[in-house]
């Protein structure tokens, strides 16, 4: 009995931990839903429209895009796909006539590139797997393809749902649940006068966990203010620096000559790359050489050597204080020479975001994950102006200022109140500085007169008393 109780407790703890890991408190309903709509039956299977909808408010899927996989329940094959393709055909040797598109029991599907012939396209396809965040671009948060499945069931009762769904977006981090049959999707005809519906529909829900995606954070935060000369940098090794130092083409440390082109390698896999993160000095010849911005097939970053070793740094500067308002400056810097960020997003949590007056160079959208609690907002770039964060270098930064109206019941510059509680970049939480390092408010001037003036006044009073 005691053993059974312990086993049950362990199971409940495991389930609780797995749910908690994939839960984002600033986007509690965020997920990616994959929906299969069977739109017609074929002699040996069915044709399904597969739609992937990103319901995450501020996390997108960047290049090289998504990869969706699953395991067939029986011996199904993919006869054809429109709007996507399987990465491997597999062993189709038993087919004598028409050859299927894929015979793999565990196919992996990727989006097509833009510009493919029209007869290979379908609505919401062919974007190289790039999917926007729902809060930033709802129209771009959907991706779709059509698949013809053979050697499968041909009725609602004989179709076996695929299992073991996986989603890479583009790297790890997503966990998908089982396929669940739901009420059939209803469609409106173009003239909106007739309704049709799918023959069968099932959905799969995938949630993201930053802990599964990377051992280390992928961004860090630094602070400064007008009322204190202290600049609080990102924490040392905020994104991982390894435990056995740097290795590679020279140490690049204190004895390295500026501009000698030496590089270092972070053996700790900072920024989520376990194979070691190479870095180069910002003033080295290599940083200015042709090809330094060329991405690698494995996605390994090339970072500028810093104490924090993060691909992204977010700097929050408390800039000005007015009678009824105060102003903060936000600057985002890219330290990765091999990656730019299209349609980047920045999320900040701060109590005064409930009274934003103006954002000067970014788009701003309040996020209300808990109804009327308005302390979280999303910043993103202006289209064709700064919605692209360039690679590391002189143009690898974007910045804006935020003007907020004071609420005198809560406003203060003391004890770090003016700095954000949390910062997210592209959906990943950034490493904050330790609270005891925040720029402090200098002591106020004494209310009474200076000591020298008080002493002089006391001496004069004594003289007057003696004279009297």
Swiss-Prot record:
GO CC annotations, alphabetized: plasma membrane; side of membrane
Primary site of residence: membrane
Record Pfam families: COB_C (PF25079), COBRA (PF04833)
Record's bilayer topology term: Lipid-anchor; GPI-anchor
Residues bearing attached sugar chains per UniProt: 31, 156, 164, 228, 340, 355, 374
Lipidation (GPI-anchor amidated asparagine): 443
Bilayer-crossing regions: none
Compartments, as annotated in UniProt: Cell membrane
Function noted in UniProt: Involved in determining the orientation of cell expansion, probably by playing an important role in cellulose deposition. May act by recruiting cellulose synthesizing complexes to discrete positions on the cell surface.
Protein name, entry field: COBRA-like protein 5
Source organism of the structure: Oryza sativa subsp. indica
